[in-house]
Regions:
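Short, conserved non-catalytic motifs in the polymerase core
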Residues: 20-45, 61-74, 149-171
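Short acidic (Asp/Glu) and glycine-rich catalytic loops that position anionic groups and cofactors
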Residues: 27-29, 59-62, 108, 152-153, ...
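Well-ordered mid-protein domain cores that form the structural environment of catalytic cofactors
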Residues: 47, 51, 55, 72, ...
Length: 319
């Protein structure tokens, strides 16, 4: 009985006897291998309730250019914002005229990734950040219960991928970095999506200074930048961000993403020949991928894939 379950959950929370159920672990490969942990349904009800209360409070604190797990934000808004930033990186901050060649494009970007971010979140640091805003210790107790329910090799560290609370707390934690970059470094062209972030500036030495100071600041959060995924890149070379290779006046898909999807299509065609997959199911998969691909210059690529599949052209191909 749903009403009885909700009442029981309410009593457990009120009496501080609530204990989340063990997380269910499973692996996804699409294409990167990730370990996902799913909460029980009744726990998800509690987690949604706490996020529904805290989210409006923290939305007022989050910077504009944080794009993950927020209403009216997301991947595509982030890419659009990046486009506007790179068009404005010039000495006087005005729009750059369309260049004849990429060599005419000025500016640099610090493209950075935080190493093992979700596994590295320090519970005590997170709770101290939350306590600045949350004065109700009952709420803090519940948050601690949620954090402690995720068992890791290092006690007091890490959040599970797949939980709504993890996505929300990930933004709260890195809001510290956002404020440091915007208010201490005074970086004008900065945006973040989860643990990936970009800072643009015309001057390379300024970008190098940002890099060094961010490395020092992240120590206060017990975090570090990923050495292989953090680079300073001339904007004329294009920047790979959120699955796209972004240039000033065009955008491409990452080559690895295209290769992976073409292999997937070949596998699905074999399954269709064996009667294990219908044409309608393949079409659904294609429509989902086209939704991602149409944000880049991929018209010919989408035509090629449709031709290989022997399928009619979908409306999304026209975009």
């Amino acid at each position: 009985n749903l009403e009885q379950e909700i009442n029981a959950l309410h009593c457990e929370l009120k009496e501080k006897i609530y204990q989340p159920a063990p997380l269910k672990q499973f692996i996804i490969r699409d294409p990167k291998t990730r370990e996902i942990h799913a909460s029980a349904f009744r726990d998800r009800v509690a987690y949604h309730a706490i996020v529904n209360v805290l989210e409006p409070i923290y939305e007022k604190k989050f910077i504009y250019d944080s794009y993950a797990s927020r209403k009216e934000k997301g991947t595509h808004k982030s890419i659009e914002r990046y486009d506007s930033f790179q068009l404005r990186v010039s000495k006087n901050g005005q729009l750059i005229n369309k260049p004849d060649t990429n060599n005419n494009i000025v500016g640099y970007a610090l493209k950075a990734d935080i190493r093992h971010y979700f596994a590295s979140v320090d519970h005590e640091v997170l709770l101290s950040i939350l306590r600045r805003t949350i004065k109700d210790e009952h709420v803090v107790w519940l948050i601690k219960k949620i954090l402690d329910n995720f068992e890791t090799e290092i006690n007091g560290k890490g959040m599970p991928l797949g939980n709504l609370t993890s996505q929300f707390f990930a933004n709260v934690y890195l809001n510290e970095l956002d404020y440091f970059v915007k208010h201490h470094l005074r970086a004008k062209y900065y945006l973040r999506y989860v643990d990936d972030f970009v800072i643009l500036h015309q001057n390379k030495k300024t970008v190098e200074s940002y890099h060094e100071r961010i490395i020092c600041f992240l120590k206060s959060l017990n975090l570090e930048l990923h050495p292989d995924k953090t680079k300073i890149i001339p904007l004329r070379n294009g920047l790979t961000f959120l699955g796209y290779r972004n240039f000033h006046y065009h955008r491409l898909l990452r080559k690895s993403n295209v290769r992976t999807y073409k292999k997937k299509i070949l596998r699905e065609q074999e399954l269709m020949k064996k009667g294990l997959l219908s044409q309608e199911e393949i079409m659904q998969h294609l429509q989902g991928w086209f939704g991602y691909a149409q944000w880049a210059n991929t018209y010919r690529l989408r035509q090629e894939i449709m031709k290989k599949c022997g399928l009619k052209k979908p409306s999304s191909l026209d975009a």
